[in-house]
C-alpha cells in the first residue's frame, strides 16, 4: 500500500520509486468533506492520507496510527532560515559554523516551528529510536529544538553543495538512498534532519523548509515515499487525534 498525503488541496505526491495508481481528486475532495462532517473541528484543513491503490481517503489520524506503529524514516528538511545570509564554505568543516556571517542560520520563526513540531510528535506519541542530522549548524539546531532524542551527525545526508568533499554527487546520493532504505528498530521510527537538495536528488521529491517526508523502507535497498507533512499540519493532527469523535469512527483501512 502506497500512501500519498497533502493538505488544503496541495498537489499529491508522486512516488519516484514505485508506480502508484492515479488519485481521483474529485472523489478525494468529497471524502474530505465527509471527514469534516464526522470530525467536527471548525476551520481546520485536515491532513489527508490517500491509499493510491484504492483511492480511499483516510483521515489524518490514520497517518498518526501508522507512525505510532513504527517502521518509517521521517525525513525533515531544516526549518525556516534567514535567506539574507549565505553559506561561505572555503574548506571542509566550515558548514558546522553557527556564525551568521559565515553560514545561513535558522530564523526565529523557524526555531519556534522546530519546537512546535517536537511538541506535536511527543503529544502523538510517535516513537523515535534514532535522530540523525547533517552536521550543518541549521540542521543540528533544528534537531536539537525538536528534542526527539540524542542527535548523531552524519554526512550521508549532506548538502549537495559540498558533495565534492564526500566523493562527489553520485556517491552522496547513493549514501542518502541507503539511509532512507534502512529499517528502524521494530516498533519505532528514525528521524533524519537534513537538506532539501540531497533528498530531491535522491528521490525526485523536493521538501520545503520544515516539511516532513515519510519513507517506508524495505531493508533490502529500497523504500517508498508514503506521505508529506507540512509544518502547519502537526498541530492539526494533534487536534484530530485528541478529538472525542475519533474513538467513535470505524477502523481505517491500511
Each model region followed by its residue ranges:
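Active-site-proximal alpha-helix that buttresses catalytic centers in soluble enzyme cores
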Residues: 53-155, 160-164, 205-254
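Boundary at the C-terminal end of the N-terminal hydrophobic targeting segment
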Residues: 45, 50-54
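Generic beta-sheet signal
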Residues: 71-73, 188-194
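Bacterial N-terminal signal peptides
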Residues: 33-46
Amino acid at each position: 500500500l502506497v500512501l500519498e498525503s497533502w493538505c488544503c488541496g496541495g498537489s499529491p505526491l508522486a512516488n519516484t520509486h514505485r508506480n502508484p495508481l492515479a488519485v481521483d481528486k474529485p472523489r478525494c475532495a468529497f471524502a474530505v468533506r465527509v471527514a469534516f462532517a464526522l470530525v467536527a473541528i471548525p476551520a481546520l484543513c485536515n491532513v489527508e492520507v490517500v491509499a493510491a491503490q484504492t483511492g480511499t481517503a483516510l483521515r489524518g489520524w490514520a497517518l498518526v496510527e501508522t507512525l505510532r506503529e513504527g517502521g518509517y524514516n521521517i525525513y525533515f528538511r531544516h526549518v525556516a532560515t534567514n535567506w539574507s545570509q549565505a553559506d561561505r564554505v572555503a574548506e571542509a568543516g566550515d558548514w558546522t559554523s553557527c556564525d551568521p556571517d559565515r553560514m545561513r542560520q535558522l530564523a526565529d520563526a523557524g526555531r519556534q516551528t522546530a519546537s512546535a513540531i517536537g511538541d506535536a510528535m511527543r503529544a502523538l506519541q510517535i516513537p523515535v529510536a534514532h535522530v540523525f542530522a547533517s552536521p550543518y549548524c541549521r540542521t543540528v539546531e533544528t534537531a536539537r529544538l525538536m528534542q526527539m532524542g540524542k542527535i548523531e551527525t552524519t554526512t550521508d545526508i549532506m548538502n549537495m553543495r559540498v558533495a565534492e568533499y564526500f566523493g562527489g554527487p553520485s556517491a552522496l546520493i547513493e549514501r542518502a538512498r541507503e539511509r532512507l532504505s534502512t529499517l528502524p528498530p521494530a516498533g519505532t521510527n528514525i528521524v533524519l534532519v537534513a537538506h532539501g537538495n540531497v533528498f530531491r536528488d535522491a528521490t525526485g521529491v523536493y521538501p520545503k523548509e520544515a516539511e516532513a517526508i515519510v519513507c517506508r523502507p524495505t531493508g533490502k535497498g529500497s523504500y517508498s515515499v508514503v506521505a508529506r507533512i507540512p509544518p502547519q499540519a502537526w498541530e492539526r493532527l494533534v487536534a484530530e487525534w485528541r478529538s472525542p469523535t475519533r474513538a467513535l469512527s470505524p477502523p481505517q483501512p491500511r
